[in-house]
């Protein structure tokens, strides 16, 4: 990941209003940031932002009331030594939180070394939590995938397939049935947590759907505010294919998944053929996926019935699967 654009200036601009930050000194060091190695070796954003800790170099150091109080109780010699060690770590910037006054020696050393020094009336814990969330978002793994991303029955579904299979037309049909559009053609995905991937629409394509023969359609204007979504978690990928019947597996015995940013995402394959109601099939696939997430697997239940029937031909089964 390119970390060159992540520096003291960009972090300050993005968080100054929310965290009530003031830039006290060290303006010349606005380009300070994280090295690629530091980001690569970080297991989480907690490695990049935290309370004052002289063991962790290249880290955003936050000094709260407890740290300032401890500093005030030190001898002049210890104060000077601690401040020298802190500046020698070359942090991207320092934050004095909790409305505490920045120690004069710290201000002087930051000025001389061009180390950005911020102050805020907010508590150190609140600043750390907010900056960790911010860092986790901007450093999260990202990818752009081709397809139509929709909200179907509250589930994020990506329609994929070769060009000309009718993905956009299918998306338009699903939107007309009350579902919502997130993005068409290019979908930006980011892994924001250990167990979910979130998809958004690039600003340039917001609310737009391209349909052959009709051109660009503004879905929000045509269908209303409820027909579009800002973002959704990706839960299912529906791949549209056109192939001879002999190559198509009617009952896949194993669940299919696709790796997206290191996370396995459920996948179903739907064959495109004349006369097939693809919108109904996609809705059924989504409903079936919802059942699977709840622990209900229709195919597995059928296979269990089949095995029991082979073992005991006289056994009776209920009229429904669940």
From Swiss-Prot:
Keywords: ATP-binding, Kinase, Magnesium, Metal-binding, Multifunctional enzyme, Nucleotide-binding, Serine/threonine-protein kinase, Transferase. Residues 209-218 are annotated as: Important for the catalytic mechanism of both phosphorylation and dephosphorylation. The gene is hprK. The lineage of its organism: Bacteria, Pseudomonadati, Pseudomonadota, Betaproteobacteria, Burkholderiales. The active site is at residues 146, 167, 185, 250. It comes from Burkholderia mallei (strain ATCC 23344). It is an enzyme of class 2 (transferase). This is HPr kinase/phosphorylase. ATP binds at residues 161-168. Pfam families: Hpr_kinase_C, Hpr_kinase_N. Its cofactor is Mg(2+). Catalyzes the ATP- as well as the pyrophosphate-dependent phosphorylation of a specific serine residue in HPr, a phosphocarrier protein of the phosphoenolpyruvate-dependent sugar phosphotransferase system (PTS). HprK/P also catalyzes the pyrophosphate-producing, inorganic phosphate-dependent dephosphorylation (phosphorolysis) of seryl-phosphorylated HPr (P-Ser-HPr). The keyword Magnesium applies. Disulfide bonds: none annotated.
């Amino acid at each position: 990941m390119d970390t060159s654009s992540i520096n003291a200036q960009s972090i300050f601009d993005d968080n100054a209003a929310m965290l009530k930050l003031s830039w006290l000194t060290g303006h010349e060091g606005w380009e300070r940031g994280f090295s690629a190695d530091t980001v690569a070796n970080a297991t989480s954003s907690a490695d990049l932002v935290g309370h004052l800790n002289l063991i962790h170099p290249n880290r955003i150091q936050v000094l709260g009331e407890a740290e300032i109080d401890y500093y005030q109780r030190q001898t002049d010699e210890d104060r000077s030594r601690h401040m020298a060690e802190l500046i020698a770590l070359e942090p991207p910037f320092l934050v004095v939180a909790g409305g505490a006054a920045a120690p004069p020696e710290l201000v002087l050393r930051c000025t001389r070394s061009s180390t950005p020094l911020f102050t805020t009336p907010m508590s150190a814990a609140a600043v750390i939590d907010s900056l960790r969330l911010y860092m986790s978002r901007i450093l999260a793994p990202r990818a752009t995938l081709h397809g139509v991303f929709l909200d179907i029955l509250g589930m994020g579904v990506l329609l994929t397939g070769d060009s000309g299979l009718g993905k956009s037309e299918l998306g338009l049909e699903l939107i007309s049935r009350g579902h919502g559009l997130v993005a068409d053609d290019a979908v930006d995905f980011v892994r924001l947590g250990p167990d979910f991937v979130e998809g958004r629409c690039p600003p340039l394509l917001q609310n737009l759907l391209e349909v052959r023969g009709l051109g660009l359609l503004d879905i929000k204007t045509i269908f209303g505010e409820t027909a579009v979504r800002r973002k959704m978690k990706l839960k299912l990928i529906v791949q549209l294919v056109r192939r001879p019947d002999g190559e198509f597996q009617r009952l896949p015995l194993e669940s299919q998944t696709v790796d997206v940013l290191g996370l396995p995402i459920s996948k179903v394959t739907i064959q495109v053929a004349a006369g097939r109601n693809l919108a109904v099939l996609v809705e059924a696939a989504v409903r079936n996926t919802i059942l699977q997430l709840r622990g209900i697997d229709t195919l597995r239940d059928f296979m269990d019935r089949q095995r029991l029937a082979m073992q005991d031909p006289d056994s009776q089964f209920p009229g429904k699967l669940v």
